[in-house]
Amino acid sequence: MAREKFERNKPHVNIGTIGHVDHGKTTLTAAITNVLAKKGQAQAQDYGDIDGAPEERERGITINTAHVEYETEGRHYAHVDCPGHADYVKNMITGAAQMDGAILVCAATDGPMAQTKEHILLAKQVGVPALVVALNKCDMVDDEEIIELVEMEIRELLDSYDFPGDDIPIVQVSGLKALEGDSNWESKIEELMKAVDASIPEPEREIDKPFLMAIEDVFSITGRGTVATGRIERGKVKVGEEVEIVGIRDTRLTTVTGVEMFRKLLDEGMAGDNVGLLLRGVQKEDIERGMVLVKKGSITPHTKFEGEVYVLKKEEGGRHTPFFAGYRPQFYIRTTDVTGQITAFTSDDGANVEMVMPGDRIKMTGELICPVAIEQGMRFAIREGGRTIGAGVVSKIIE
């Protein structure tokens, strides 16, 4: 019974394939499932299964993404693969597919190309912590020297984007040959997965991080006090614990005197729970949607940040016209809209950009009118009159 084995409790890791168009990301993904299927650790999928990915909507943006799952000896993986370059950009920026690590696929026949660079930069900007390189199509290159040169070029490129180029494993593979059942190339896929197991760190579980809950609603209950409701994003909170209310106004301290879920009282709430927290000494008018409750001292509010942004095309429901530095949209952060100004745009090479068109990916500097609990790696939407016109991720906190 292979089915039982599949449900063993292994640590779960989210990964994906990234890299230039036609370098073989989807073929490699199919090859991984086929090689692991022979050990009963995956369901074999062919190129067509993965390439015909259904459309999904994430924050009002349509993205095509294929999801496959498989196991290695020590882990369970969820793996995302996107058919088009624009899908990758949207996926990584919206965090629709949060990646704990990625397999960078680069063809030995071409070496690193424009999107290879762009995906490495994006991985850095959105906080993908680790990469493993699959040097694909190695069956088509006879000259060992060419392969060595391409490897050197990839390592230098990784270094230039602050990834540890010397330490990242580069495994020579052929997705196509492995799919065809060539045992030499199948063993290379196994080698690749061993490198992924070893080099992509296990993500810290949300429950082990410091407590944070974004406030969605506030009620006042006669005789009991004020209750803030929301979904606990990370960590846990116990009755009697001190927490801080952060964002929009000055940070203040309060004590959680009750945790309630589905009208039942709990001793503690934890990551993923939708709860109501009863707060001591707080009036209903003191707190509002958009503030967060956090473990004391774990987070400070900010107003100025850099972000990597994808601007929606007209067909995606975005703007029809370009905008310029000085543009004042709403930033939808966690649970609320905050007005802000985009003070500057810069391109990948650091040059200032005057005008941004629908469909562009751009780096921006934003300034909010009031301090909010923003953090590096956090996702946000840019909205105008209630409709989403862009999606972004905080790449750096300025102040």
From Swiss-Prot:
Its main location: cytoplasm. InterPro entries: EF-Tu_GTP-bd, EF-Tu_GTPase, EFTu-like_2, EFTU_2, G_TR_CS, P-loop_NTPase, Small_GTP-bd, T_Tr_GTP-bd_dom. Residues 19-26 are annotated as: G1. It is an enzyme of class 3 (hydrolase). Keywords: Cytoplasm, Elongation factor, GTP-binding, Hydrolase, Magnesium, Metal-binding, Nucleotide-binding, Protein biosynthesis. Its EC number is 3.6.5.3. It comes from the Bacteria. Residues 60-64 are annotated as: G2. One of its GO terms (cellular component) is cytosol. It holds the Pfam family GTP_EFTU. SUPFAM superfamilies: EF-Tu/eEF-1alpha/eIF2-gamma C-terminal domain, P-loop containing nucleoside triphosphate hydrolases, Translation proteins. Residues 10-204 form the tr-type G domain. Residues 81-84 are annotated as: G3. CDD domains: EF_Tu, EFTU_II, EFTU_III. Monomer. This is Elongation factor Tu.
